[in-house]
């Protein structure tokens, strides 16, 4: 009593847990660039370099990496249902900025989001390296990742029991674009039928159906009739001369045909999702940062962002306060 409060510094730095909490929140939640953050701190009278700020966040990353390792093992538990997506970012390599990619994998049931980065690549090795020997029930992606990933890896013995899904929203949006921009009248009917699948699943959500009940509805006569109508329309359109069709319509038809099995795999299981919106919403934060001209000065900077966003994304899925979690974490590691 009567003594000043003891300020604990993070080992190897002069930063307190509270200060690290503040700069991490500014950079990775509020999307403030290092340059603006540095300017703000110097305007307040602090003598600090941008490199020092990065080094402090790097120190915080070493502790968060241990947490992310645990979260990853939870996200990839046996028979998990996961969604994945990627987005591009700018990373400085060899004195210039290069377009690179950060990925995210989300496990809805476990409320876990893991961001990962492997030298900025968008290739199949990034995903397969991340998955390791995980025995997943299903993995959902968009069409590009399906093209790159499903071609070999998911058809191999390594992932033979994993159901690969492709997002239905992407298929529907392609037909909407073909109708609005390509002027293709039949494209509207495709989008209407695909929309009906979404409406049905939304009704199941509103009714609070169990996976077993949802499976029964997905296998109903009405659903099968809708599927037959869509397939008949697709076969009919593909049999016609495509010379005078818009490229948007050709792309939509080819997409639906190529990924038909993966798009409608959800009908065979009451637990599987219909789209990849969960992963897309989770990674949208990085898209916002990119639009704010955020860039990473190195691969290490992108890897650090992946660590912080893994924690932030997971906390958001739990509906908890990011500010409070980060602060409590850094205060309790000492």
Task: Please provide the spans of the model-predicted regions.
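Catalytic center-proximal scaffold of phosphoryl-transfer enzymes
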Residues: 2-334
